Amino acid sequence: MFGLGITEILLILGIIILIFGAKKLPEVGSGLGRAIQNFKKASSESEEIDVTPSKDKNKDA
């Protein structure tokens, strides 16, 4: 996993717990999960662009 061993992962998790605290960790995790879910949803949606020319009835020509 990205060239990280178990020691590095545990060290990163320890630093995260020190920064955010144990009580805020569930909030941070759920917010991160929602952000990832929204990103996946937005990237998987097909982007359809309407390229048909619009007929402008009030056109001065």
Swiss-Prot record:
GO terms for molecular function: protein transmembrane transporter activity. InterPro entries: TatA/B/E, TatA/E. The chain crosses the membrane at residues 1-21. Gene3D superfamilies: 1.20.5.3310. Pfam families: TatA_B_E (PF02416). It is found in: Cell inner membrane. Keywords: Cell inner membrane, Cell membrane, Membrane, Protein transport, Translocation, Transmembrane, Transmembrane helix, Transport. It is a single-pass membrane protein. GO terms for biological process: protein transport by the Tat complex. Disulfide bonds: none annotated. Its main location: membrane. One of its GO terms (cellular component) is TAT protein transport complex. The Tat system comprises two distinct complexes: a TatABC complex, containing multiple copies of TatA, TatB and TatC subunits, and a separate TatA complex, containing only TatA subunits. Substrates initially bind to the TatABC complex, which probably triggers association of the separate TatA complex to form the active translocon. Part of the twin-arginine translocation (Tat) system that transports large folded proteins containing a characteristic twin-arginine motif in their signal peptide across membranes. TatA could form the protein-conducting channel of the Tat system. Belongs to the TatA/E family. This is Sec-independent protein translocase protein TatA. It comes from Maridesulfovibrio salexigens (strain ATCC 14822 / DSM 2638 / NCIMB 8403 / VKM B-1763) (Desulfovibrio salexigens). The lineage of its organism: Bacteria, Pseudomonadati, Thermodesulfobacteriota, Desulfovibrionia, Desulfovibrionales.
